From Swiss-Prot:
GO molecular function, one term: tryptophan synthase activity
Any one GO cellular component localisation term in the record: cytoplasm
Record-given protein name: Tryptophan synthase beta chain
Classification via PANTHER family: TRYPTOPHAN SYNTHASE, TRYPTOPHAN SYNTHASE-RELATED
Keywords, alphabetical: Amino-acid biosynthesis, Aromatic amino acid biosynthesis, Lyase, Pyridoxal phosphate, Tryptophan biosynthesis
Catalytic reactions on record: (1S,2R)-1-C-(indol-3-yl)glycerol 3-phosphate + L-serine = D-glyceraldehyde 3-phosphate + L-tryptophan + H2O
Gene from which this protein is expressed: trpB
Length: 409
């Protein structure tokens, strides 16, 4: 990567919400006033000490932050090579990184006088986090979830309902995250007066990509401090799984200007990155286009129609990527690779067997890439992987994929 590309990689987006050629706000006239109001509210909140004091109090006493930075000793010994640390965001309240961001958005929603919260969800973790925070603050919660994901993420559907949320199965398209987001946007257009759309990833129209990144950046900030305390220096490599890319952006962002730190995002390779598009690796196998209010890399056909893609992981089953990731890819600051379903399943089992940690299928993709590269690294190479979610929600999917009979277990 050329040293003279930029003075800083942390100044974006610009006033139009763009990261280079990516991002922006491609929304209907009905939504534009709400988007501009949200941007104004967030710009004010960013410099409001009372906002961040409330966030820090909730992160500490409700979420349970800071999450540990854990040296995976047996995994390191099994693989040889790099010294592997796991950022344990699966230990957060609700079991994933999603609640870091949801708290911030719902505090903003309350400041804006909104009483009805809508959200999209794939793996269900963002839906659970949104339902959780809505229950805490007494807000109405509606979660849009693809019908396919409702079936494969049944435990999280039940959790959302227990928390008082209305779960709306989306049957259009292939019934996955893209379709859930489409229906959530349609709801928002219809109910702009009292409704706040709590987006779960670093995608969507500006200011969402930057706002979600800023709320998730607590992951990387903690990691910097914890690594300095544990090793006396910064990590050499960061690795995180990428669907829309919020957990990865949260880990990566505080390190973007540290050019000694290698950054790797891991996309869902599905059945393999090929012309059949049986994957969700939009950076590896897609091209630029516009979806859900922003310009980014997408899986699309020759006519620009969005393709469905595939991943065993509901949280990575999205045919796009956050615009800041698209920009980092194009300028060469971060590297993006893909991992197949099979490789992720193998890594899922390895984590269980070596560390006693049942990972979600999303970070299992990141772990699979760790398994590929760690053995060839020197023993003093410090590698940090974000364990962004726990695998309780995925045990039935994994059992089916491995041919295990859960009824006879």
């Amino acid at each position: 990567m050329p040293d003279d590309l930029l003075n800083s990689f942390m100044t974006g987006p610009d006033e139009k919400g763009r990261f280079g050629d990516f991002g922006g706000r491609f929304v209907s006239e009905t939504l534009m006033p709400l988007i501009l109001e949200l941007e104004q509210q967030y710009e004010h909140a960013k410099t409001d000490d009372s906002f961040w004091a409330e966030m820090q109090d909730l992160w500490t006493h409700y979420v349970g932050r800071p999450s540990p930075l854990y040296f995976a000793k047996r995994l390191t010994e099994r693989l040889g090579g790099a010294k592997i640390y796991l950022k344990r965001d699966e230990l957060n309240h609700t079991g994933a990184h999603k609640i870091n961001n949801v708290l911030g958005q719902i505090i903003l929603a309350r400041r804006m006088g909104k009483t009805r919260i809508i959200a999209e969800t794939g793996a269900g973790q963002h839906g659970v986090a949104t339902a959780t925070v809505c229950a805490k603050f007494g807000l109405k919660c509606i979660v849009y979830m693809g019908a396919t994901d409702v079936e494969r993420q049944a435990p999280n559907v039940f959790r959302m309902k227990l928390l008082g949320a209305e779960v709306v199965p989306v049957t259009s398209g292939r019934g996955t995250l893209k379709d859930a987001m489409n229906d959530a946007l349609r709801d928002w257009v219809t109910n702009v007066r009292d409704t706040f759309y709590c987006i779960g990833t670093v995608a969507g129209p500006h200011p969402y990509p930057a706002m979600v990144r800023d709320f998730q950046a607590i992951i990387g900030k903690e990691t910097r401090d914890q690594m300095m305390a544990a090793e006396g220096r910064l990590p050499d490599t960061l690795i995180a799984a990428i669907g829309g890319g919020s957990n990865a952006m949260g880990l990566f962002f505080p390190f973007l200007d540290d050019k000694s730190v290698n950054i790797i995002g891991v996309e869902a390779g599905g059945h393999g990155v090929n012309e059949k598009m049986e994957h969700c690796a939009s950076l590896t196998g897609g091209r630029p286009g516009v979806l859900h209010g922003n310009r980014t890399y997408l899986l699309q056909d020759e006519d620009g129609q969005i393709l469905e893609g595939h991943s065993i992981s509901a949280g990575l089953d999205y045919p796009g990527i956050g615009p800041e990731h698209a920009w980092l890819h194009e300028i060469g600051r971060a590297q993006y690779v893909s991992i197949t379903d099979r490789e992720a399943l193998d890594a899922f089992q390895l984590s269980c067997e070596t560390e006693g940690i049942i990972p979600a299928l999303e970070p299992s993709h990141a772990l699979a890439h760790v398994c590929k590269i760690a053995p060839d690294m020197p023993r003093d190479h410090l590698l940090v992987m974000n364990m962004c979610g726990r695998g309780d929600k995925d045990i039935f999917t994994v059992a089916r994929a491995l041919g295990w009979d859960m009824d006879g277990a």
